[in-house]
Amino acid sequence: MNLKNYIIIFDSSLGGLSIYKQIKKKFPYMNYIYVCDNKNFPYGEKDEIFILKRSIKIISTITKKITTILVILACNTITVTSLTTLKNFFNFPIIGVIPNLNKARKITKNNIIGLLGTKITIHHYYIQNHISLFVPKYKIKLLANNTLVKIAEQKIKNQLISTKNIKFILEPLLKKHNMPDTLILGCTHFSFLKEEIKKIFPKKIQIIDSKVHIPKNISTILARNLKTTNNNIAFFSKKIITTKTIHYLLKKYNFKKIKELNT
């Protein structure tokens, strides 16, 4: 394998496809590699040291024979725990995803904002410090939950999910006297549950996905690349059952090759 000019998108499973959709719209002519560490899904239940070591191992393995333009950590948990160290460890650009509090404060009308994420993400000092910039003017209601990630993964795989279970998880945000009118999804998996979440809230709620900010200098390099995207590859750390559902899903996202990543 000797591949050139790739954007690598890395997540613990399939939730990062929501980030791929964002980036693909902006840079449609790039070649993409999607790396899925499904052997260790979900990362929200792992400790920080494990996530960092695992991220270094996977990125090192996948970039050995690939000319990498950019690595995107398509996972809030990887971003808050490992981004700074990974940027110092590797010599190519690495960016992550963060909850978009700036957008939330601009569109909220009652100044009550919900933030939904995994336990590691919500309780991490990076997020806590970020939130402190917005209080007391804005009331930020935090909800940390790992089960919702698994529910989202089931939906992505076209499996049946229970709206009742989602409602039970969201119950702390549904109290009438201080219900948020804006909800930030602090996990890329949650983008796939938008419709269910909207139906659960009794009032109209604005839902905001995690934000990917690509620095201007990298955007310029990517914009120059005119290569047609026809060589996208998806890597899984654990051999998947090659069901029609997974094949259809990846084909829909233009990933024609599925390979196992031996790590």
From Swiss-Prot:
Pathway: Cell wall biogenesis; peptidoglycan biosynthesis. The active site is at residues 75, 187. Signal peptide: none annotated. InterPro entries: Asp/Glu_race, Asp/Glu_racemase_AS_2, Glu_race. GO terms for biological process: cell wall organization; peptidoglycan biosynthetic process; regulation of cell shape. GO terms for molecular function: glutamate racemase activity. Provides the (R)-glutamate required for cell wall biosynthesis. PANTHER family: GLUTAMATE RACEMASE (PTHR21198:SF2). This is Glutamate racemase. It comes from Buchnera aphidicola subsp. Baizongia pistaciae (strain Bp). The lineage of its organism: Bacteria, Pseudomonadati, Pseudomonadota, Gammaproteobacteria, Enterobacterales.
